[in-house]
Amino acid sequence: WDNTLRFRHLLWDQGLHLAEAMDTAQRGAGVDWHTASELIQRSLTEARTHPLKPRVACGAGTDHFAIKQLQSEAALIAAYSQQMEMIEAAGGQCIIMASRALPAISAGPDVYARIYGYLLEQAAEPVILHWLGDVFDPALRGYWGYQDIAKASTAVLSIIEDHQDKIDGIKISLLDQTHEEAFRKRLPSDVRLYTGDDFNYPALIAGDGNHYSHALLGIIAAIAPALVQALEALAK
C-alpha cells in the first residue's frame, strides 16, 4: 500500500488528477471489489492531505456480483448503486463503468436508458460515463443496445442529453479517432469527452481547433513527467 500511494503522490505532485480503480476495478489483474474499494478509500484519504487537492474519480461497476445474479434491471441498479454510494461516501467522483451484465441479458436501448437514467438522477454530483469497446473486452459488444456503433452513439447521446446536468463527461475507449472526433462534436457544450484511445491520444488531446478530448487513460502514468511538460507547452 505504501508504494501504491507513494506513486499517486508523484502524479499529484506534477499537477495531474487521478482516475482510480478503473482497470483494477475491471478485475483484469484479479483485484476484487473488496480490494478495489480499499484502494479507493486510501487514495481519497491521501488526496485530501495533498496541497494541490487533486481530483479523484473512481470506477463504479457491478462486478461484486456474478453476471447470473444480474438478470433484472432492479438487480443491476442495486449493484451499481452500492459501488457508487461507497465512492460518494468516501468523497470521490463516480465513473460509471460498462457492465458485462447488460450485453449478457441482451439489453435494448430502452433498458440502458432506464438504468442509467436512474443512476444519474440519484448521483450526488455529476459523473463520468465510460464506453469501453469490444476491442478491449469482447463481452461488451453491443453496448448501449446496438451492435452498430452509429446507432449506439445516438443511444448514449440521448441519455446524455436527457441528464446532462448530472454528467461531467464520457470516456470513450473505442480506438477509433474518426468516430471520437465526430462524437465529441455532438456532445452538449458543457459535457467533456475523455479519451481512452491509447493509439491516437496525442492528436485527440491537441484537438482540431474547435474541439478537443480530455485525457483519461493509463498511458499517462507511465509518461507523466514528459506529458506534463507537453501539456504546458500546448497551453501556450
Named regions from a protein language model:
Residues 1-150:
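Active-site beta->alpha loop and helix N-cap motifs at the rims of alpha/beta catalytic domains
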Residues 124-236:
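Catalytic alpha/beta core domains of metabolic enzymes, predominantly
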